[in-house]
Amino acid sequence: MPAIAGPSSSPQKHVVGSRSESIGGVRSAEVNTSRKRKLISDSAAEVSATVVLPVNSISTPMKWKSPRRCAVSIPKTSDEEIKEDSNEKLENPVISVCLEVKSKWNPKDDEQMKAVKEALHVSKAPSTVVCREDEQRRVFEFVKGCMEQKKAGSLYICGCPGTGKSLSMEKVRLQAEEWAKQAGLHCPETVSVNCTSLTKSTDIFSKILGNYESGKKANGSFSPLQQLQRLFSQKQQQSRSKMMLIIADEMDYLITRDRGVLHELFMLTTLPLSRCILIGTVFCVINVHFLKSVSYGQTSFKFKVRICPPGVANAIDLADRFLPKLKSLNCKPLVVTFRAYSKDQILRILQERLVALPFVAFQSNALEICARKVSAASGDMRKALCVCRSALEILEIEVRGSIDQEPKGPVPECQVVKMDHMIAALSKTFKSPIVDTIQSLPQHQQIIVCSAAKAFRGSKKDRTIAELNKLYLEICKSSMITPAGITEFSNMCTVLNDQGILKLSLARDDKLKRVSLRVDEADITFALKEIRFFRNCLL
């Protein structure tokens, strides 16, 4: 019978043989059988050798064997080997490949930890703006068209915080300068102003004038705005070939009561000889917050959601609300909307930042849950980077603690940022202020809050203080805690009312005051779930 693999090329076969030698009685009985039985047994042993071959080794179709023959030919596998094999199957294939290709990540190495933190820092500008190619192209085409035609124009960008507006504007500025050199045109004079740094909103005109006429003595008889208006209205301005690119970041800070500053800034682009290209970024968000509870397995946490509508209506109509004269002059600025990042976009940006590192510091499912929760909350990329850095710090504290306990112990395998680290970081970042308030309350006030949560689970929306006190006494009695008197109980309810947890109505008698719950029951459960006593009280 032809052999499946030769003795010298099949170490697995020798392993099988050595293991099967330990079964002494069975092996000796097998030697004393007939030649036919021996051939069958040998073929079974060869088939069993193919079973333990690696995936990349040569394999043949397996033959059916009876349970008795399997017990003889196949060696027993320990529980540890089965567990190890199952862990290898459950392991993420992407991380496995990366771990094989890249060097091993050691969280105890200060240099490696520093490199990961720098890669995830907000101040680190990536070489390319990922997931904002279309928006960046629209802005660049606008600037390019103005420079080719030597014509002024205005554009504003609206979007939620952390959607890449400022970073994209910096890339557009560099693109415009590079394109102007290639086209043989003068590079535009660029003025970048962060409006949050201005002492007064009118200071933006001084910034523009100082850059436009650097080295020239300012005319004290005219204001900076008047001097700019004269410069862009004089005939000799036609001989000036350079364009001026004004980038006003956080331009909504210029919105005053009379809207005069914002209006005059855009009006500079409508002057007959103006060569201003004005680009402004506008922060826009509807300030509505609510708490959303998310469960992952047996772990649940809450985070604050800030609504940023898909159309960003309060920014798109900025020209209609604050710049009505521009619309009448047919000079309405162009609008480019930067929408909040989606889950896939956040995940891609995180991977782009980490792929350059020579090691793997995050599990893929940990990055995925971070992207999912941040996109559901706000779509703020800066928040996602903050969460990842926080998860990395949690791992660092965990590793430092293990070093203190076992200074000479071996380094544990695969000490990367896992799901539990990321969930803890998300809970820390998006935790509601009311959760902190409930957690910092004294014990008896926390018992009152638990009593209120149980009292309002049904259809009844409010109860009297006497009814709430009855539930409070039941919890104290079952836990053998000395309860407070009715007067002290009423005073504690007043304190909870002042903190926005309970709502008390007015009544002549304290016992007749109506009590209702201002916070969500899920907030109370989330705040007190770590304490077994309160967890049992809320059942």
Curated annotation (Swiss-Prot):
Keyword Cell division: yes
GO molecular function: ATP hydrolysis activity
Residue segments, region Disordered: 1-40
Keyword list, A-Z: Cell cycle, Cell division, DNA replication, Nucleus
Keyword Repeat found: no
CDD domains tied to this protein: AAA, Cdc6_C
SUPFAM superfamilies given in the database record: P-loop containing nucleoside triphosphate hydrolases (SSF52540), Winged helix' DNA-binding domain (SSF46785)
GO process terms (BP): cell division; DNA endoreduplication; DNA replication initiation
Annotated InterPro entries: AAA_22, Cdc6/18, Cdc6_C, Cdc6_ORC1-like_ATPase_lid, ORC1/CDC6, P-loop_NTPase, WH-like_DNA-bd_sf, WH_DNA-bd_sf
Tissue expr: Highly expressed in roots, flower buds and etiolated seedlings. Expressed in leaves and stems. Highly expressed in proliferating cells such as root meristems, leaf primordia and young growing leaves, as well as cells undergoing endoreduplication cycles.
Span(s) of short sequence motif Nuclear localization signal: 35-38
A Gene Ontology cellular-component term: nucleus
Subcellular location: Nucleus
One Pfam family linked to the record: Cdc6_C
Predominant localisation class: nucleus
Superkingdom in the source lineage: Eukaryota
Induction: Cell cycle regulated. Up-regulated at the G1/S phase transition and then decreases rapidly as cells progress into S-phase. Degraded in a proteasome-dependent manner in proliferating cells, but not in endoreduplicating cells.
Family that this chain belongs to: Belongs to the CDC6/cdc18 family.
Function of the protein: May be involved in the initiation of DNA replication. May play a role in endoreduplication. Could act as one of the factors that contributes to maintain endoreduplication competence.
Additional information: Cells expressing ectopically CDC6 have increased levels of endopolyploidy.
Record protein name field: Cell division control protein 6 homolog
Record lineage: Eukaryota, Viridiplantae, Streptophyta, Embryophyta, Tracheophyta
